[in-house]
C-alpha cells in the first residue's frame, strides 16, 4: 500500500514557511534592501529618552541635554511651542527632536519635558523650549551650533539648567 502525503497539512507547512520568509525579508535593513530610512535625528522615536552629556561650549566643558543617540540638543531663542520659527528649509539644518510618546530622561532633570504638537510634528520641549539637533555636529560632544544666528534668533545649547520659556 502506497502512503500519500497529507496534502492539506503539506499546504499549511508551505504557506507557513512562505509567510516566515516574507516577514524576514520585510524586516531586513541590509545593504541593497528596498525601502528608505530616515536620519536618526529627524525620525520620531517612541517615548524619546533624553540623556545628558558633555560638550565643549565656548571653549569650556559643559553638561548638555543630548538626544537618544548622544548628540547635543539646542533651542532657538525666538521659538514658541505653539508657533515654531524653525520650519521648512530650517529643518534640514536643525532637525527637530520628535516623539511618538511621552518623553522622559535617563537622568533626573529639574525641569519639565513636554510634547508640543505643531507644524513640525510631535516635538519634544524642555521647560517650554522646542529641542533640535544641529546637522553640523558630526560627533558626540560637538556643540558647533551654539551662538549661531539664523531663522530670526540665536541657537543655544540646551542644558539641564535651562529656565522656563516666557
Regions inferred by a protein language model and the residue ranges of each:
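Extracellular/lumenal glycan-associated surfaces
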Residues: 67-82, 126-140
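Bacterial lipoprotein signal-peptidase II cleavage site
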Residues: 26-38
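A low-complexity, Ser/Thr/Gly/Pro-enriched, surface-exposed linker/loop concept
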Residues: 39, 83-114, 152-166
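C-terminal motif of bacterial Sec signal peptides marking the signal peptidase cleavage site
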Residues: 21-25
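Bacterial N-terminal signal peptides that target proteins for export
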Residues: 2-14
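Extracytosolic low-complexity repeat regions of secreted or lipid-anchored proteins
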Residues: 108-163
Amino acid at each position: 500500500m502506497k502512503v500519500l502525503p497529507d496534502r492539506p497539512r503539506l499546504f499549511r507547512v508551505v504557506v507557513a514557511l512562505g509567510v516566515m520568509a516574507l516577514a524576514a525579508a520585510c524586516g531586513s535593513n541590509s545593504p541593497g534592501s528596498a525601502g528608505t530610512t530616515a536620519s536618526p535625528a529627524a525620525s520620531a522615536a517612541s517615548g524619546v529618552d533624553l540623556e545628558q552629556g558633555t560638550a565643549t561650549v565656548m571653549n569650556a566643558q559643559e553638561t548638555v541635554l543630548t538626544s537618544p543617540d548622544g548628540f547635543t540638543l539646542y533651542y532657538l531663542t525666538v521659538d514658541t511651542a505653539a508657533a515654531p520659527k524653525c520650519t521648512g528649509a530650517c529643518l534640514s539644518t536643525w532637525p527637530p527632536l520628535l516623539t511618538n510618546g511621552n518623553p522622559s530622561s535617563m537622568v533626573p532633570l529639574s525641569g519639565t519635558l513636554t510634547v508640543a504638537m505643531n507644524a513640525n510634528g510631535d516635538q519634544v520641549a524642555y521647560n517650554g523650549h522646542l529641542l533640535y539637533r544641529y546637522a553640523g555636529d558630526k560627533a558626540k560632544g560637538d556643540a558647533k551650533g551654539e551662538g549661531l544666528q539664523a531663522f530670526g534668533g540665536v541657537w543655544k545649547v540646551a542644558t539641564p539648567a535651562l529656565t522656563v520659556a516666557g
